A protein has these predicted regions:
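Short beta-strand segments of immunoglobulin-like
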Residues: 38-43
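Helical hinge/lid and interdomain linker segments adjacent to catalytic or ligand-binding clefts
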Residues: 313-316, 325-327, 331-333, 439-519
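Short, hydrophobic beta-strand segments
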Residues: 51, 182, 320-332, 354
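Short, aromatic- and glycine-rich surface loops/edge beta-strands on solvent-exposed regions
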Residues: 335-341
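Extracellular glycan-associated modules
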Residues: 45-50, 70, 74-294
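Proline/serine/threonine-rich low-complexity linkers at boundaries of modular beta-sandwich domains
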Residues: 6-33
Length: 519
């Protein structure tokens, strides 16, 4: 039986869910089929933009560009308003599904010419043992090897043969060192698994035992080896931390340190000449097996913060094929625009922000779109969790229903990965369902109310984004006498704050219209 508080909460949530009723998009009860994103999110008139579209069912439709004056369809708002562009001709486009493949991993492609011996070693710390995953794999045209957890147990797959590499179960958040000596010529493997630290960082490093096992394996031949960490040959992913990987192929040694090249997705080798690349942005600069608890940031002791934390649901870049590449007209006015796709399976709008062309005249006023905040909340599922709590999921709009059914869209900073760790990265290189007209009651939609308000007052204004200020600094703000914030300018980088303070010292006037800002 529902408590009175649950009933009241349910009534409030139902009102929130029913706020956004518009005939321009899918309605509650409809199944959302079409989605997409664009790159970049903010650009100047005359620059190039790409739109990436996908539909779960093949659909024919028309794509056009609209200038969005107001994206708020609520009864209390000024009214939804958009204007198709005459300067960009609509296109008939057939959409098919472009899959999402989340999950971070690392990869190096290593030279090999039918080696006799291969040895592999690395530290690993499982963080989600209830889910099976491949910790490391080696693949060639003529064979493969996978190291994986099957529940609590560490196992190996060598060609068609599987073995348990350690009889004792693994423990979550405990560091282990695995060393495999693979004698391909003799078809034998020696596996050593050492446990060198407790689950508590406050304790000293201890030798807690080593397990050694030998196996006879099927014949495996390697030419070039695709060496992956946290990924299998079939694309499966793993949750946990890995540090200090090394692989020796006959006499060629390859070693990498994840404490190096922290600003890059590619790690140069300590030994050998093959780089190792990260995909879907695992968390870097996290504590490794030798962290002693004395240092609280990676810059103080990089050799102790030398691990990468992989998650099966990390998503930095959807990696879709561009559906359309477009050069915007030079004379396009600054404003909020959308790619609008109207097809047999529904309608989807993907917003983007246009600044004046580099040679164009600027307005005196700019509306600063808080895109950093949009990204922090991107694809958040807070309303979904609230709806589940009170049994009101049927009241969700299609965008939220879609998010509930598609965790492969990635997470926001307001969620946790299934292993309990926080979400470090939130990206715009994926469909962001709340970055849609009318999709949410805060962030983007009410910011379009401000745009409509200024337009209604016939106040000439340009659009600038957080990303522009972070990238260009003072130069992005300098043309303007007045900056108007969005309704929720919550997240600011140091570069943004420095630029804003310098702009104000030079005489700029800031109109803060936010209810939660400048953290």
């Amino acid at each position: 039986m529902e408590s009175q508080s649950q009933q009241v909460t349910g009534q409030i949530l139902t009102q929130i869910f029913n706020l956004h009723q518009t005939g321009t998009d899918n309605q509650p009860g409809d199944a959302k089929q079409i989605t997409g994103y664009c790159e970049p999110l903010s650009l100047r008139a005359g620059e190039q933009i790409q739109w990436f579209g996908s539909s779960h069912v093949p659909t024919n439709g028309r794509l056009d560009l609209v200038r969005l004056e107001c994206g708020d369809p609520t009864r209390s708002g000024p009214g939804f308003s958009e204007h198709p562009l005459d300067s960009v001709s609509p296109l008939d486009i057939e959409l098919v599904e472009q899959p999402l493949v989340p999950g971070s991993f690392a990869e190096a492609i290593l030279p090999a010419d039918d080696p006799k011996n291969v040895s592999v070693g690395f530290w690993f710390q499982p963080t989600l043992l209830k889910r099976d995953g491949v910790i490391a794999s080696m693949q060639s045209d003529d064979g493969f090897i996978e190291i994986f957890n099957q529940g609590d147990y560490l196992c190996g797959r060598f060609g068609g043969a599987e073995f348990r590499l350690r009889e004792r179960p693994l423990e979550r958040r405990r560091w282990y060192f695995l060393h495999l000596d693979i004698q391909l010529s003799d078809r034998r493997v020696t596996a050593k698994v050492a446990t060198q630290r407790s689950a508590s960082p406050a304790r000293d490093l201890l030798q807690l035992g080593e397990d050694t096992k030998e196996f006879e394996i099927p014949a495996i031949a390697f030419n070039a080896i695709v060496f992956r960490l946290a990924a299998g040959i079939d694309g499966s992913r793993w949750d946990g931390r890995i540090a200090a990987p090394e692989i020796v192929i006959d006499d060629a040694t390859h070693i990498w340190s994840f404490a190096d090249d922290m600003e890059s997705a590619v790690v140069k080798p300590i030994s050998g000449d093959t780089e190792l690349a990260f995909y879907q942005l695992p968390a870097r600069g996290v504590t490794g097996p030798h962290w002693n608890g004395e240092h609280q940031r990676w810059t103080e002791a990089p050799d102790q913060w030398d691990a990468a934390h992989f998650h099966h649901d990390d998503l930095y870049d959807a990696g879709w094929t561009p559906t359309l590449t477009l050069d915007l007209p030079e004379e396009l006015p600054s404003g909020i625009y959308c790619f609008r796709y109207q097809g047999d399976a529904g309608t989807d709008r993907v917003p983007f922000f246009v600044r004046p062309a580099a040679t164009a005249t600027h307005s005196d006023i700019a509306l600063l779109m808080p895109t950093c905040t949009y990204m922090a909340y991107a694809n958040h599922r807070m309303l979904i969790e609230g709806a589940d709590f009170v049994g009101a999921r049927n009241n969700l709009r299609p965008e939220h229903q879609y998010l509930a059914e598609h965790r492969d869209l990635g997470l926001s900073h307001y969620e946790k990965h299934p292993d309990g760790s926080g979400v470090m990265f939130s990206s715009r290189r994926r469909p962001v369902l709340q970055l849609r007209p009318g999709a949410d009651g805060w962030n983007f939609t009410p910011d379009t109310d401000l745009n409509a308000f200024l337009t209604h007052l016939e106040v000439n204004h340009d659009i600038v984004s957080d990303e522009d200020v972070h990238t260009e600094g003072l130069a992005a703000l300098a043309p303007y006498r007045v900056i108007v914030t969005g309704t929720h300018p919550e997240y600011w980088s140091t570069a943004m704050l420095d630029a804003l303070e310098e702009w104000q010292r030079s005489g700029g006037r800031l109109m803060y219209l936010g209810g939660n800002g400048f953290y």
